[in-house]
From Swiss-Prot:
Family per similarity comment: Belongs to the SNF2/RAD54 helicase family. RapA subfamily.
NCBIfam families the record matches: PRK04914.1
InterPro entries documented for this protein: Helicase_ATP-bd (IPR014001), Helicase_C-like (IPR001650), Helicase_RapA (IPR023949), P-loop_NTPase (IPR027417), RapA_C (IPR022737), SNF2-like_sf (IPR038718), SNF2/RAD54-like_C (IPR049730), SNF2_N (IPR000330)
UniProt-recorded name of the protein: RNA polymerase-associated protein RapA
Keywords: Activator, ATP-binding, DNA-binding, Helicase, Hydrolase, Nucleotide-binding, Transcription, Transcription regulation
Record-listed E.C. numbers: 3.6.4.-
Length: 968
């Protein structure tokens, strides 16, 4: 093409320079000025990597002054183009804009514009873009969306609760599962779903001070949720940045004490417009009608302002009726306003529970029971269902299940209360106790005697604490020269046990970090035992490394030595051997220790080894825990209640262990109290509530569905393809691990979600559960989500050119592969993507307008194509530009017809599902007062907005690929 001064060209290799202007031409060279950057480039006239830029009628162009022109016609004089059209800002027609006056900061937004401007992408990027569109659309539609990306085992009851509650508008519920059933994980799953769906953006977690770091770690490690921890220092720092310090972060964890201490701070917190608040250990909020505690009032004030509330608490039976009512009152003060009325209501639910038990028993239903069921559901004609349920006909089980579902919907608090027990959930191991009685060394005997004389002024509590840890007493007297580990028989026993069981992973827990550190040194120096240490002095990253070393099967540590505080929130199901080097002070801490191994998913029975010194507080405590509470071999829901009631006597025995008079009778008294309380708890079990909480077949179906998706290889292939194209380095490690590090030439300087020093990932859920240093990558992981956004929000892969070597077709045959996207713009909280995610429509159109896409599958066709370099590609495009324009025009009507089908189907699905959900809630609100009117109103509003936005859905060309047939 001849060059003329004033023409506009673009560089094929440096498109970031913008639009260039020809400023000098001689016989061999041409000079382009790029005004956007002020740079000049010199090119050879023949075969230079630049492309002529000429717009077409229908395009909108921008002048260097900023105004825009809709092009109606084009004229050329002496090789320079002028555009004639309508000016958008003044509506003036017949306006002439010479190409030399075009804006130099030109951005080609449409794929066809980029194609004609020579801004061609690599073929593999086009393929990645299409796959990204396809997979993203599929993922949005899955029923398990929001539930798959967590580093958790697939536990049916947890998935059921998260699926039910996570999809609600502003959920207000009580999570009251027994210990070890994963309330924290359920809460995290709900938070994760609410955030992903756009139902929540600002989340507050209020916890006891000792659990702050545990929550921080759990949210980050399991759900990839980065919370900010607010304490006095962080609050003071945030005050410099905002009038309301809590506005500086979207997701915050703070302690209840931090909020309670300062009235102004509480007001700021209440004003911060949270969408969801989680309160852990909510059973500690003391309430009575006459005198609610300050802590209760604090949470009550926040609960009045925050639309979504999750309260994590002990089981209702443990709490007692009044305390249970107090939690429900926080969730819905209008519904639960009168305690006496609440007690009366609860009595009316027993016939419902009886009816469910009857249906579950698969026995014939008598006349009295039939009348009861008719009375309970009097507003509906259930006679046909009852007849089927009471027969031997096909459909009997389905009829009974439907009746149970109908009863559950009417159950008083099953929408606001979820409570699972170990009795109702399978998958827990046995626990076996091994007591190792050891002699008390003379060194300790002497230290204890001297301590008794010197600490006469200490309280019984303080003396009891001292007596539990004789090594601490000894070390205090001896100072740095004390070496208790040289004579303590527990150390000798531990070394012997570990050397005899070198093939077993062993978790050793002791109360103090100093003890753990000293034991590590002894084990390493004396026996060469590899032991990782885990204590509160380590950073989260250091704890991760210690946990990963312990978890590793190859060259991993045999032992993990944990302090009491350091082990909070960490679980090691892959190990089944536990040694308690000493004992904790109360039953809750004991259960917390055992809970490190005793989790759902533990496949072996747990062996609990307790080496204790005779004639010490340890000997008293091990006997009390085992014989008085049965706390080692079974979970002990009564532990705290018994502990509180006998605290003074227990402390007296621990403070003076040599005085054992009456100890046996005391322990028998505790056991009797434990048995009585346990029987009361069992009697108070609510079978219907348990049935609703564990989800039954629904929960199992969710788990099976996710497990099947976990085994799909598509994610691995896509992710590795994404990392290659983005420029992320990958290094394979053993055990299904990959180390990712930023490359030198990435598509973006900083890839969101990838740390500067890299990270270790795995696509294997089980591997992620045992390797805490490895991130579990799923479709919901930030690295994948950010990768999808990076590709799809920009123009990566939006136009390409390929050669098809096929002798069955004439040379020069032209095909255009077009990817249209059907989409609707709407606020995220409407979750339009459930019905209409950005959906790709793939077309393969020839010169005659025939769409061949249905006959040519993408992946197999893509493998037959060959790449073209950018320079050759630009020449090909210029040669067939008019044909491509015509093919795109021919495709538009076909694309519109396909898009309309997609939109109509989405609208029909949305109308059916949302109307059914609304009708169900409206019908149930007549028989179940726990269905809030604001929930019904929100659903109706949501339905109307969803349908309205779907009516306005549109489509656009997202990417295209030019394919030219060759025989070479």
């Amino acid at each position: 093409m001849p060059f003329t001064l004033g023409q506009r060209w673009i560089s094929d290799t440096e498109s970031e320079l913008g639009l260039g202007t020809v400023v000098a031409v001689d016989t061999r060279m041409v000079t382009l000025l790029f005004p956007a950057t002020g740079e000049n480039r010199l090119y050879a006239r023949n075969d230079s990597p630049i492309t002529r830029v000429v717009f077409n009628p229908g395009d909108t162009i921008t002048s260097h002054e900023g105004w825009q022109l809709d092009v109606d016609e084009i004229t050329t004089a002496n090789g320079v183009v002028s555009y004639i059209g309508t000016r958008l800002d003044t509506s003036e027609t017949g306006v002439v804009l010479r190409e030399v006056m075009l804006d130099s900061k030109l951005v080609f937004g449409k794929p066809q514009d980029r194609l004609f401007a020579g801004q061609l992408d690599r073929m593999d990027r086009f393929a990645l873009r299409f796959r990204a569109r396809k997979y993203q659309s599929e993922q949005y539609r899955l029923a398990t969306s929001g539930l798959r990306g967590m580093r958790t085992s697939l536990i049916p009851h947890q998935l059921h609760i998260a699926h039910d509650v996570g999809r609600r508008h502003a959920p207000r519920v009580l999570l009251a599962d027994e210990v070890g059933l994963g309330k924290t994980i359920e809460a995290g799953m709900i938070i994760h779903q609410q955030l992903q769906a756009g139902r929540a953006e600002r989340v507050l977690i209020v916890v006891p001070e000792t659990l702050q770091h545990q929550w921080l770690v759990e949210m980050l490690r399991r759900f990839n949720l980065r919370f900010a921890l607010f304490d006095d220092d962080r609050y003071a720092q945030a005050q410099l940045d905002s009038d309301n310090p809590f506005d500086t972060e979207q997701m915050i964890i703070c302690s209840l004490d931090f909020v309670r201490r300062n009235k102004q701070r509480l007001e700021k917190l209440a004003d911060a417009e949270w969408d969801l608040m989680v309160v852990d250990e909510a059973h500690h909020l003391v309430w009575s009608e006459d005198a609610p505690s300050r802590e209760y009032q604090v949470i009550e004030q926040l609960a009045e302002q925050v639309p979504g509330i999750l309260l994590l608490t002990a089981t209702p039976e443990q709490l007692g009726m009044e305390s249970h009512f107090a939690r429900l009152r926080l969730l819905d003060p209008d519904r639960f306003h009168d305690f006496a009325q609440f007690v009366e209501e609860q009595k009316h639910f027993s016939p419902i529970a009886d009816a469910v038990t009857l249906l579950l028993a698969d026995q014939k239903i008598g006349n009295d029971e039939l009348n009861l069921l008719n009375d309970l559901m009097g507003e509906q004609d259930i006679e046909p269902l009852l007849q089927t349920a009471n027969s031997d006909r096909e459909g009997k089980l389905a009829a009974r299940q439907e009746l149970i579902s109908m009863l559950m919907d009417r159950h008083g608090t099953s929408r606001v209360l979820f409570r699972n027990t170990r009795n109702g959930v399978k998958g827990f191991p046995k626990r076996e106790l091994h007591q190792i009685r050891l002699p008390l060394p003379t060194q300790y005997q002497t230290a204890i005697k001297v301590s008794g004389i010197m600490s006469a002024r200490k309280t019984a509590d303080e003396r009891a604490q001292d007596m539990l840890y004789p090594e601490q007493i000894y070390q205090e007297f001896e100072g740095d020269s004390g070496t208790w580990w040289n004579f303590d028989p527990r150390v000798e026993w531990l070394m012997g046990y570990l050397t005899s069981n070198r093939d077993k992973k062993v978790l050793v827990i002791c109360a103090k970090a100093a003890t753990a550190l000293q034991l590590e040194q002894v084990l390493r120096e004396r026996e060469g035992i590899r032991a990782a240490v885990f204590h509160e002095g380590l950073s989260i990253i250091e704890r991760d490394r210690a946990a990963a070393w312990f978890a590793s099967e190859e060259d991993g540590a045999q032992v993990l030595l944990c302090s009491e505080i350091g082990s909070e929130g960490r679980n090691f199901q892959f190990a089944s051997q536990m040694v308690m080097f000493d004992l904790p002070f109360n039953p809750d801490l004991l259960e917390q220790r055992i809970g490190r191994l005793d989790r759902i998913g533990q496949v072996h029975d747990i062996q609990i080894h307790v080496p204790y010194l005779e004639k010490t507080a340890q000997a008293v405590l091990v006997q009390w825990y085992h014989e008085g509470l049965d706390a080692f071999e079974h979970t002990c829901p009564t532990g705290r209640a018994v502990y509180d009631s006998v605290y003074t006597q227990l402390i007296a025995y621990l403070a003076a262990p040599e005085n054992s008079e009456g100890l046996e009778a005391f322990i028998q008294h505790c056991r009797k109290q434990h048995d009585t309380l346990k029987a009361q708890l069992e009697q108070g079990r609510d079978r219907l509530l348990e049935l609703n909480s564990n989800g039954g077949e629904k929960g199992q179906a969710l788990a099976d569905m996710i497990a099947e998706q976990d085994n799909n290889i598509e994610l691995v292939n896509f992710a590795l393809n994404l990392f290659d194209i983005v420029g992320i380095n990958q290094e394979d490690r053993s055990d299904n691990l990959i180390v990712l590090t930023p490359g030198d030439h990435m598509l973006v300087p900083d890839f969101p979600g990838l740390p500067e020093d890299g990270c270790t990932i795995t696509f294997d859920r089980n591997q992620a559960l045992s390797r805490e240093d490895a991130q579990y990558v799923s479709w919901e992981h930030p690295i994948i989500r950010n990768g999808l956004d990076l590709i799809l929000s920009g123009d990566t892969g939006s136009c390409a050119i390929s050669l098809l070597k096929n002798k069955a077709l004439p040379v020069g045959t032209l095909l255009v592969e077009l990817i249209y996207v059907v989409e609707a713009q709407a606020p995220k909280h409407l979750q339009l993507t459930r019905f209409l995610p950005p959906t790709p429509i793939r077309m393969m159109v020839d010169r005659k307008g025939n769409n061949l896409a249905a006959k040519v599958e993408f992946e197999s066709f893509n493998r037959q194509l060959n790449a073209v370099n950018r320079h050759t590609g630009s020449k090909l495009v210029n040669a067939v530009q008019s044909d491509v324009h015509e093919i795109i025009t021919l495709s538009e009507d076909q694309a519109a017809a396909e898009a309309r089908k997609v939109i109509d189907a989405a609208r029909q699905e949305a109308d059916e599902k949302l109307s059914a959900e609304l009708s169900r809630l409206q019908a149930l609100s007549a028989v179940n007062p726990n269905i809030r009117q604001d929930e019904i109103d929100a659903l109706e509003s949501n339905r109307q907005q969803v349908l309205s936005n779907l009516d306005e859905a549109g489509w656009r060309l997202d990417a295209l690929r030019l394919i030219v047939v060759t025989h070479q």
